[in-house]
């Protein structure tokens, strides 16, 4: 499977700054504003994509799972929501193994998610789509496809249809595509930060 690959690593009190910087260079231009958010607390900060400033903000939140809004928001907006997202820059496929809720994926389970991700890339590449950014999300895989769409209902409908179509085509009993990640203020785990879900 041809792709850019980033991995999710880290421990309870650290993160991989190098992986974070790689992802920033690929996904978050320095002049764009995004929200980063810690879960489950909901602590958040909106800022421009200056790598040093973003790394500082992430470092303040790494005691929790840290996410970013995948699409740009209005300058100085306090939060990412439907009214503050400027446009849609990324189509996200979130592939996870089927497992008990709140339990970390085993290596075998992650392999099943990897196979589904590979099938998606092969399918879309055969239809002329570009190479995506592949991210190890800790318990599964994310595929980021670059798009240029407005933040409007028609774009949301198109993205929702794409997710459903690919899920119907490639879901397996062992791993599935999340069909719900079609909202414009969608957040996703920042590469290089710790995937906190269940026991290690």
Question: Which positions does each model-derived feature cover?
Answer:
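DNA replication initiation on ssDNA origins
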Residues: 1-90, 95-107, 111, 194
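Conserved short beta-strand edge segments in small beta-sheet-based binding/regulatory domains
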Residues: 67-69, 168-182
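Helical (often loop-to-helix) elements that flank the catalytic cores of nucleotide-handling enzymes
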Residues: 102-125, 147-175, 196-200
């Amino acid at each position: 499977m041809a792709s850019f690959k980033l991995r999710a690593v880290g421990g309870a009190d650290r993160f991989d700054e190098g992986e974070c910087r790689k992802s920033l260079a690929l996904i978050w231009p320095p002049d764009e504003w995004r929200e980063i958010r810690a879960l489950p607390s909901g602590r958040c900060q909106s800022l421009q994509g200056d790598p040093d400033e973003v790394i500082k903000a992430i470092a303040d939140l790494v005691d929790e799972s840290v996410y970013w809004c995948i699409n740009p928001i209005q300058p100085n907006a306090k939060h990412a929501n439907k009214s503050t997202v400027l446009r849609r820059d990324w189509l996200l496929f979130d592939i996870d193994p089927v497992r008990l809720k709140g339990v970390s994926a085993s290596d075998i389970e992650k392999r099943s998610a990897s196979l589904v991700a590979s099938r998606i890339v092969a399918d879309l590449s055969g239809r002329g789509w570009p190479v995506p950014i592949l991210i190890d999300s800790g318990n599964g895989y994310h595929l980021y496809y670059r798009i240029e769409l407005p933040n409007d209902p028609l774009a949301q409908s198109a993205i929702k249809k794409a997710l459903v179509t690919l899920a119907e085509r490639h879901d397996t009993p062992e791993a599935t595509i999340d069909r719900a990640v079609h909202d414009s203020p969608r957040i996703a785990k920042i590469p290089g930060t710790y995937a906190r879900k269940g026991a290690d």
